[in-house]
């Protein structure tokens, strides 16, 4: 369902064909869940935003339950945060996981066709909590990274070699070299790296240096000296008027861990402090309002209600406690529209467009 003009989708499709796998295409994002139930795939390509939607669906399902069923459901959901790749659990935790799998996780697999073994994820960083939910439900997330200029994948979590780590995009692929520049930028060499942009030597010189290293534009580290972890985009980092730098993507990912925050953009270049534009998760926010007897006529009125603003602000405050003093969000503004590729705030692969 991702655009075939996108090198990520195209290259993975080539790999599927090489392995003799059948490929099914879904033309409408709204039909994905029903198509998965019908096709019953063993794996599918995705982007983090869609997997966040899947996770939100699991949470919504639990909230529809009552009594002991609801308690068991969220006990099982919370249990997923113990998941780590290639980890041996103790006897008590193993028993809990076995019970949760029979009662809850098996239902999640069934909701996604019942056959999924792997979910390929790329295009942006996936929140670790979502990777753990999928992993505990026996749907391992193969998160990787790359660019069109690198053909595209340079690193990916590899279950065949048991080289997987949550929160990273996995080990570097064989044949590639990666190093971290002094400013934190990820540089790479390898057979898949382009020779240059077509008839654009000046543009090529901006990204390939004299030693042949391609500058990816991503900021990251090598965790344990082996697993690549991307923390932000170099061009998206901005400076406050006081001289401190802000890496917005890291803050945005933390904020989106709240079930009430659908999308967020951290801003504040050349300002005294960082602020955030927030598109709420309106279905869940509507549920919260119904539960707390908060009345409104439409979303425009909803986002202006003091109790709603306070609720979202409390979610932001929790994240602020984990940030440095200069990184903390000092002001928020709620918007009444859902951000989509059609409205222009998101790209076709559901990444945030900051220059809208």
Please place each PLM-identified region on the residue numbering.
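Conserved A3 ("GATE") glycine/threonine-rich loop of ANL adenylate-forming enzymes
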Residues: 6-8, 49, 123-130, 143-160, ...
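Adenylate-forming
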Residues: 193, 227-256, 285-306, 325-329, ...
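Active-site loops of AMP-binding adenylate-forming
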Residues: 126, 134-140, 147-166, 200-203, ...
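Conserved ANL (AMP-binding/adenylate-forming) active-site segment centered on the GW(Y/F)…HTG consensus within
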Residues: 95, 162, 166, 193-217, ...
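Conserved AMP-binding/adenylation subdomain of ANL enzymes
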Residues: 4-105, 115
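Conserved ATP-binding/catalytic segment of the ANL
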Residues: 171-240, 257
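Conserved C-terminal "lid"/linker of ANL adenylate-forming enzymes
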Residues: 263-267, 313-356
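C-terminal boundary motif of the adenylate-forming
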Residues: 219, 224, 258-283
């Amino acid at each position: 369902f991702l655009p075939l003009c996108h090198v990520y989708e195209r290259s993975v499709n080539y790999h599927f064909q090489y392995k003799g796998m059948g490929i099914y295409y879904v033309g409408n994002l709204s039909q994905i869940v029903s198509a998965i139930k019908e096709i019953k795939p063993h794996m599918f390509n995705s982007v983090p935003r869609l997997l966040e939607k899947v996770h939100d669906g699991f949470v919504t399902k639990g909230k529809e339950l009552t009594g002991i069923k609801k308690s068991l459901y969220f006990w099982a959901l919370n249990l997923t945060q113990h998941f780590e790749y290639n980890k041996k659990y103790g006897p008590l935790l193993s028993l809990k996981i076995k019970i949760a799998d029979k009662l809850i996780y098996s239902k999640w697999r069934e909701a996604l066709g019942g056959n999924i073994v792997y979910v390929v994820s790329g295009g942006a960083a996936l929140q670790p909590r979502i990777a753990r939910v999928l992993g505990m439900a026996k749907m391992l997330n193969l998160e990787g990274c790359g660019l069109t200029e690198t053909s595209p994948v340079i690193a990916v979590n590899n279950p065949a070699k048991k080289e997987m780590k949550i929160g990273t995009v996995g080990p570097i692929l064989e044949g590639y070299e990666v190093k971290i520049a002094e400013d934190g930028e990820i540089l790479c060499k390898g057979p898949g790296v382009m020779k240059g942009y077509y008839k654009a030597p000046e543009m090529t010189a901006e990204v390939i240096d004299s030693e042949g290293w391609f500058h990816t534009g991503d900021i990251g580290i090598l965790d344990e000296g082996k697993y690549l972890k991307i923390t932000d985009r170099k061009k998206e980092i901005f400076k406050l008027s006081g001289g401190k730098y802000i890496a917005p993507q890291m803050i945005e990912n933390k904020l989106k861990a709240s079930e009430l925050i659908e999308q967020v953009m951290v801003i504040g270049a050349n300002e005294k402090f960082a602020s955030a534009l927030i598109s709420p998760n309106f279905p869940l926010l509507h549920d919260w309002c119904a539960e707390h007897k908060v009345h409104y006529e439409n979303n425009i009125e909803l986002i202006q209600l003091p109790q709603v603003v306070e609720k979202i602000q409390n979610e932001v405050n929790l994240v602020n406690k984990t940030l440095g003093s200069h990184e903390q969000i000092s002001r928020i503004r709620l918007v009444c529209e859902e951000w989509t590729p059609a409205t222009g705030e998101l790209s076709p692969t559901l990444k945030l467009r900051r220059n809208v």
